[in-house]
Amino acid sequence: MKHIVKHIHFVGIGGAGMSGIAEVLVNLGYQVSGSDLARNAVTDRLAALGARIAIGHDAANIEGANAVVVSTAVRSDNPEVLAARAQRVPIVQRAVMLAELMRLKQGIAIAGTHGKTTTTSLVASVLAAGGLDPTFVIGGRLISAGANARLGTGDFIVAEADESDASFLNLYPVIEVITNIDADHMDTYGHDFARLKQAFIEFTQRLPFYGSAVVCVDDPNVRQIIPFISKPVVRYGLSPDAQVRAEDIDARDGRMHFTVIREGRAPLAVVLNLPGLHNVQNALAAIAIATDLGVSDDAIQQALAEFNGVGRRFQRYGDVPTADGGRYTLIDDYGHHPVEMAATIAAARGAFPGRRLVLAFQPHRYTRTRDCFDDFVNVLSTVDALVLTEVYAAGEAAIATANGDALSRALRAAGKVEPVFVETVDALPEALAKVAQDGDVVITMGAGSIGGVPAKIVQNTQQKG
């Protein structure tokens, strides 16, 4: 590619999916430019690496580019897209560019409705501990690396495979992981769950004859598609028929202790530096791949015990003073689907038994809130105290029956929790200061602008101190 394409421009370069690919391309020696609506830590990092960053979208930003990379979130009337089309500069989907990177190495693609980012991070960390020095592209910041992407010298590239827009069908990896299949982003599949499952089957058909599908048999929908997978399958999970499974699971001190049972191998005692059964499952996927690639048991154990997590995935911000002189524990999480939220809440209950759980939640997308409305009411009713904000639209038109006020009314009618509703995330720090008590565990959760709230709370605390 490099002899023809030297300058690559990214529209929306600050996004999690785009920035990782851009960083790898910078490190491969390409000239990279990009634009976004606002400056952030990601754009600053890319600029420091040598990328040319523009704030705001303008036709002039693509000057000299041989290719323009876009995601499905970029509108067709974006001025940079229009300029590229007028100048006959190829417009490349993000997943297609990721597929080009995978052609340079052997790809390990992590798919599934939930758990992709954490599983990708665990796989990359375990392979790195085993000396394989993988390249990785992750949808969140791997805390140990300080970035969501890295160019390694090894043979493998580990990346998330996105089913939300069916773009994972552009990838041709040698190993695939399917963590679970759940009803999300159903607009892509015509609100037909059978079509979504068929897309995952087609994803496995991208594997070469020597490839393998590493699948979680605890998920009933994944289990249903196994008979239709024509390539070798490795089953992992907590189920008795899993080839890589966890037994004797014990949650202690925010960590998961368990024994891994693998066919033809001695039992392996593991301490995972993450809470929650869902993270045990995610770790099993990494263990299955690492075992197949010859990573030593010692390296597997070390990587999982020392795993520092991923930004916005049960990320701990430490203890914060309360108004009455006590302290509460602050955690931030990206969960935005009821299934993810339930798993995180369960993990918090296990990590902090007996403590009051306060949730600050910003729903993400009106369509998701509408489609999962009853499930949101059920999962939000399981916390001890709730602060709710208006829905983060993500470009969607508002739906009056699926906005924050409608969700608040439904929660009050359910009668299990009395939500405190605030219109904006800017009001969250003050609202939480009134709600939080000594000894509480406070979780800020959502995929939108709520991600900036924990740092704001910490900053406010430091200024007062």
Curated annotation (Swiss-Prot):
It comes from the Bacteria. GO terms for cellular component: cytoplasm. Keywords: ATP-binding, Cell cycle, Cell division, Cell shape, Cell wall biogenesis/degradation, Cytoplasm, Ligase, Nucleotide-binding, Peptidoglycan synthesis. InterPro entries: Mur-like_cat_sf, Mur_ligase_C, Mur_ligase_C_dom_sf, Mur_ligase_cen, Mur_ligase_N, MurCDEF_pg_biosynth, UDP-N-AcMur_Ala_ligase_MurC. One of its GO terms (molecular function) is UDP-N-acetylmuramate-L-alanine ligase activity. It is found in: Cytoplasm. It catalyses: UDP-N-acetyl-alpha-D-muramate + L-alanine + ATP = UDP-N-acetyl-alpha-D-muramoyl-L-alanine + ADP + phosphate + H(+). Its EC number is 6.3.2.8. Coiled coil: none annotated. Pathway: Cell wall biogenesis; peptidoglycan biosynthesis. It holds the Pfam family Mur_ligase. One of its GO terms (biological process) is regulation of cell shape. ATP binds at residues 112-118. PANTHER family: UDP-N-ACETYLMURAMATE--L-ALANINE LIGASE, UDP-N-ACETYLMURAMATE--L-ALANINE LIGASE-RELATED. NCBIfam families: murC. Cell wall formation. Belongs to the MurCDEF family. This is UDP-N-acetylmuramate--L-alanine ligase. It comes from Burkholderia multivorans (strain ATCC 17616 / 249).
